[in-house]
């Protein structure tokens, strides 16, 4: 009998999630089509979490059940499914999954509800979501998720300025220094080598949990300084160009600086999370 009841509850929860899928597809519209396959797969996997956090599930009315133990609600079933799915996601990808849930919830809310800037709304949603999921699922969620999203505009601007040498080096806006007077073959430092050293030194001084955000800003600064014609021919050119810039920046900085950069860095770049990039260019 209990097995039959649980089967009914699971069916009801599945129906709730199916209704959510329709809402999701309507709410996302074109932005859903821009997502990469990995992001779409994670969104499908995390739909129970979206359903539960939006409380799109209600108590099941089954008067024939006699005990309170059997009076489970569809929300409890969806909560279990949410935690089960989150536990199956590797730790390094959980930030990515949580970002997707936040983005899904925000896009489904009426825009009139957000009286403050969209980014601040995302920060609050991310913080609340982290607290809820960590407690509800008793599961590890990287601290970087929260800290990285709580950077304010002024902090991002400071990171941007601090890593100006990295922007300069990655764009190769430095040239070899001509030193004609040495008569023996010795190392002749170039301005690029000096800028590279400054870049690595600045990056090493940034706390690990903020390095992803710093690299995002560097990549965005580089992308904004490139002629717009380079990005013609792509659908929604900004996002693919930004992804490629960040990927290349990560590879270059990891190899040349020999410092720890979180593996999670590439994940948040697959969303339209606002980034501050006000660097105005020029070699340092």
From Swiss-Prot:
This is Avenin-like b8. It holds the Pfam family Gliadin. Seed storage protein. Might be integrated via inter-chain disulfide bonds within the glutenin polymer. Belongs to the prolamin family. It comes from the Eukaryota. GO terms for molecular function: nutrient reservoir activity. The keyword Disulfide bond applies. Contains disulfide bonds. Keywords: Disulfide bond, Seed storage protein, Signal, Storage protein. PANTHER family: AVENIN-LIKE B5, PROLAMIN PPROL 14P. It comes from Triticum aestivum. Residues 1-18 form the signal peptide. Gene3D superfamilies: Plant lipid-transfer and hydrophobic proteins.
